[in-house]
């Protein structure tokens, strides 16, 4: 067998490397590696040479069959060396936007692969000559049944559902390819960064596997230095957005399953040793309980982690406006931390103060804009910078303002957040998954507090270890990406999940993990009201022992009579702040009628009037995030002429037109 043939079968190469010493003659024949080997003693000699490390062979007598075995062994060893070079997934790098990057956004060629012909053979086994090879015919008779360069293009970042009408409902595999010129810089390494790919992504560079990632809303990156070459290169991504019971989110959810590379793609240039992540916050108090940043401490805490456990590396922190220029040295684990005296102006919705920050290590300088604030609870109050605050919020899906498609830019974020500002909001719930980094940063600049959430939504596979690992990975990635955003005050771990011991064990582990990663923010989740007797609601949920803020969704007026709202009483047996994380009802913009006629603007308007009056009677109410800012696409909403695959609970239509209920909520917030 030639080296060229073995190159086409990496699984076989790996088998050879691992099993050569244990293979029998029958094994060689069965695997089709070498045929007609005569004289088992000659084979044993080859194996003995490996044990004795006597390669090249030193014994004199060589037969034709032994020489064949030598050639095979040479091939194995050579391919072993080749296969060790490649790409590796590396931990998420904090603040991509503040580093040296090259954008790969723009037009990507795509091929729709309904039966995954480009990945599996006809026996459903992965094979080594899939679409990721980007193969071209070398002779007139060569059979290659795909061609990226002749395929159509779509924009990245972007979803395929709204860029190709044939793919509006499509859930499956699409291959995307981008060619680009690259010239390596001496002494630097290159990471390939994706802001998000929904949902299952296999990534290839120049025909070789860079890595695999699962999860549709958080960033990931690979070190692809050894896969890139000087000159023309290409990246191919196999994207699959099919839904599965063990996924997070699971098979059913009430939003559009936008497939594709939905956020930025960048090449990131780094030094061999670089700052992987860092955190800046106000100094922690030393009171009882979990440490929280303290307004009166007069200190700033800085910590940083290198990509390698390298001691003695110098990291410099500079905040010019605060006259900070301080060096700190890493320990044996590659981390460094320091507490500095400083009294920055505190970030708030009224004064969203941000400071320019520079972090230098070696030849690399990272820039950021960071604010400082405190967030804590006291009894049933939420305190921002030591003062009680009422969170005047709204829930938002990550969907463009102009009719649909996944939002993916600062401009998209600014439009949606401006609508929330016009409503009188100081708070947004980014539902039901981590939104793109542009949205969080734009909210910070605009003075908008943020609730950020992972998609543990409805019916998760609570007892599946892989499902938990997936959820924890998404939680970790969300926190690592946004841990320096002053406006993020709540990490949410779930939405509307059914009560069970298995669910409690799953979610309490997530809450614990969130606190381990970041004890400077509040933990919550959107619960359901499950204990109701006539007009008395009692919020009973074991998870309330694990959260800092009790949050629940209720739809009085939509899933029960709107007139019941005035009769409702609420019992929340916890000395914790309360957020009503969802309420509302649907209306189609421009449809008018009596206030008891469902789907009219008047029905929604009256529902908001009755609900806001009811909310005023809830003891300990610290905020609310009604459902939802704008109408959004959902395959579950099929009522022709009304829903047309839109959830109509928005205060704006999908085109940005205000419904009557907008003014009810705006006026109510003006009193808070």
Language model segments and positions:
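Glycine-biased, low-complexity coil/linker segments
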Residues: 29-31, 38-41
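Short Gly/Ser/Thr- and charged-rich N-terminal loops/segments
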Residues: 27-32, 285-295
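Extended acidic/polar, glycine-enriched regions
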Residues: 229-232, 303-378
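Active-site-adjacent substrate/metal-binding segments within catalytic domains
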Residues: 141-143, 152-181, 186-205, 211-212, ...
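Hydrophobic h-region of N-terminal signal peptides that target proteins for export
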Residues: 78-86
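Short, positively charged and aromatic/hydrophobic N-terminal segments
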Residues: 6, 11-14, 22-25, 33-36, ...
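Substrate-binding clefts and catalytic carboxylate motifs of secreted carbohydrate-active enzymes
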Residues: 94-121, 131-133, 154, 197, ...
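Accessory beta-strand-rich segments of carbohydrate-active enzymes
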Residues: 90, 94-95, 111-115, 166-275, ...
């Amino acid at each position: 067998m030639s080296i060229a043939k073995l190159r086409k079968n990496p699984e076989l190469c790996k088998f050879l490397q691992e099993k050569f010493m244990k293979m029998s003659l029958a094994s060689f024949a069965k695997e089709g590696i070498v045929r007609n080997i005569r004289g088992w003693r000659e084979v044993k000699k080859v194996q003995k040479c490996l044990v004795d490390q006597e390669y090249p062979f030193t014994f004199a007598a060589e037969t034709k069959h032994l020489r064949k075995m030598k050639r095979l062994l040479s091939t194995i060893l050579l391919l072993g060396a080749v296969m060790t070079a490649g790409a590796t997934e590396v931990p998420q790098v904090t603040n991509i936007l503040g580093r040296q990057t090259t954008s790969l956004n723009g037009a990507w060629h795509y091929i729709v692969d309904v039966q995954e012909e480009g990945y599996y053979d006809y026996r459903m086994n992965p094979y080594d000559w899939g679409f990721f090879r980007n193969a071209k015919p070398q002779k007139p008779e060569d059979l290659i049944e795909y061609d990226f360069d002749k395929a159509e293009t779509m924009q990245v970042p972007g979803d395929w559902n709204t860029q190709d009408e044939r793919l509006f409902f499509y859930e499956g595999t699409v291959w995307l390819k981008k060619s680009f010129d690259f010239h390596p810089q001496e002494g630097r390494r290159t990471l390939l960064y994706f802001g998000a790919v929904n949902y299952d992504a296999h990534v290839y560079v120049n025909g070789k596997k860079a890595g695999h990632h699962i999860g549709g809303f958080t960033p990931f990156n690979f070190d692809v230095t050894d896969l890139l070459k000087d000159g023309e290169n290409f990246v191919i991504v196999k994207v699959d957005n099919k839904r599965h019971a063990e996924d997070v989110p699971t098979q059913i959810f009430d939003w559009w399953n936008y497939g594709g590379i939905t956020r930025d793609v960048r090449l990131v240039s780094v030094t061999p040793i670089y700052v992987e992540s860092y955190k800046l916050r106000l100094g922690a108090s030393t009171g009882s309980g979990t440490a929280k940043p303290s307004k009166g401490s007069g200190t700033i805490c800085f910590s940083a982690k290198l990509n390698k456990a390298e001691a003695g590396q110098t990291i410099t922190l500079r905040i010019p406006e605060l006259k900070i220029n301080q060096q700190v040295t890493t320990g044996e684990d590659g981390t460094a931390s320091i507490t500095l005296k400083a009294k920055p102006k505190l970030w708030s919705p009224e004064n969203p103060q941000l400071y320019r920050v520079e972090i230098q290590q070696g030849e690399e300088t990272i820039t950021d804009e960071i604010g400082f604030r405190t967030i804590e609870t006291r009894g049933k109050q939420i305190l921002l910078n030591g003062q009680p605050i009422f969170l005047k919020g709204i829930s938002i899906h990550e969907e463009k303002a102009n009719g649909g498609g996944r939002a993916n830019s600062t401009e998209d974020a600014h439009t949606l957040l401006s609508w929330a500002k016009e409503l009188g909001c100081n708070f947004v719930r980014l539902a039901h998954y981590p939104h793109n980094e542009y949205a969080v940063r734009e909210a910070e600049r605009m003075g908008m507090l943020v609730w950020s959430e992972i998609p543990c939504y409805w019916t998760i596979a609570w007892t599946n270890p892989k499902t938990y690992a997936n959820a924890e990975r998404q939680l970790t990635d969300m926190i690592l990406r946004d841990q320096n955003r002053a406006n993020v005050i709540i990490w949410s771990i779930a939405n509307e999940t059914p009560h069970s011991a298995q669910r409690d064990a799953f979610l309490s582990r997530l809450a614990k993990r969130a606190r381990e990663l970041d004890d400077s923010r509040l933990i919550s989740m959107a619960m359901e009201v499950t204990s109701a007797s006539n007009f008395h609601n009692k919020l009973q949920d074991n998870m309330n022992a694990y959260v800092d803020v009790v949050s629940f969704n209720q739809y009085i007026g939509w899933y029960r009579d709107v007139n019941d709202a005035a009769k409702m009483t609420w019992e929340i047996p916890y000395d914790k702040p309360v957020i009503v994380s969802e309420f509302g009802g649907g209306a189609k913009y421009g449809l008018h009628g009596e206030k008891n006629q469902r789907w009219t603007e008047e029905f929604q308007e009256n529902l908001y009037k009755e609900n806001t009056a009811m909310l005023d009677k809830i003891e300990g109410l610290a905020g609310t995030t009604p459902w939802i800012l704008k109408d959004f696409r959902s395959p579950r909403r099929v009522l022709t002429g009304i829903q047309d695959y839109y959830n109509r609970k928005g205060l704006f239509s999908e085109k940005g037109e205000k419904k009557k209920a907008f003014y009810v909520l705006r006026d109510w917030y003006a009193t808070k």
